[in-house]
């Protein structure tokens, strides 16, 4: 493989990676905990966009439980975003003929 071909392939990879990042940022992923009483929505980069806590949980006044449920819901949403991102980057590596790149 000559250097020019390698450089073109690297440039193409960089452009495609940027497109994937932009697409992922525009997507949203939801995680939940407590049987759906706590829901978190993150974008494809894992940033928290929205949080919903069922008012009945707030009435219980069990702050530690609520905090734990929030953490679990956010982590679940972030994990979904991470899996989607990894899937897209794996496809990118496969499309460029670079198996196992991501």
UniProtKB/Swiss-Prot annotation:
Any single GO CC term annotated in Swiss-Prot or TrEMBL for this entry: cytosol
Keyword Secreted: no
Species lineage: Bacteria, Pseudomonadati, Verrucomicrobiota, Methylacidiphilae, Methylacidiphilales
Organism: Methylacidiphilum infernorum (isolate V4) (Methylokorus infernorum (strain V4))
UniProt xrefs under NCBIfam families: DNA_YbaB_EbfC
PANTHER family xref list: NUCLEOID-ASSOCIATED PROTEIN YBAB
Entry keyword annotation includes Lipid metabolism: no
Family, as annotated: Belongs to the YbaB/EbfC family.
Subcellular localization: Cytoplasm, Nucleoid
Major localization listed first in the record, in broad terms: cytoplasm
Protein name, UniProt field: Nucleoid-associated protein Minf_1672
Subunit structure: Homodimer.
Signal peptide (residue range): none
Top-rank lineage group of the source organism: Bacteria
Keywords: Cytoplasm, DNA-binding
Matches recorded under InterPro entries: YbaB-like_sf (IPR036894), YbaB/EbfC (IPR004401)
GO MF annotation terms: DNA binding
Function: Binds to DNA and alters its conformation. May be involved in regulation of gene expression, nucleoid organization and DNA protection.
């Amino acid at each position: 493989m000559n250097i020019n071909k390698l450089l073109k392939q690297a440039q193409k990879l960089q452009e495609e990676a940027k497109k994937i990042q932009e697409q992922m940022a525009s997507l949203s992923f939801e995680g939940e905990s407590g049987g759906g009483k706590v829901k978190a929505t993150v974008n494809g980069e894992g940033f928290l966009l929205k949080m919903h806590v069922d008012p009945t949980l707030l009435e219980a006044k069990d702050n530690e439980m609520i905090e734990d449920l929030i953490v679990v819901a956010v982590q679940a949403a972030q994990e979904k975003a991470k899996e989607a991102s990894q899937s897209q980057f794996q496809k990118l590596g496969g499309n460029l003929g670079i198996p196992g790149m991501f």
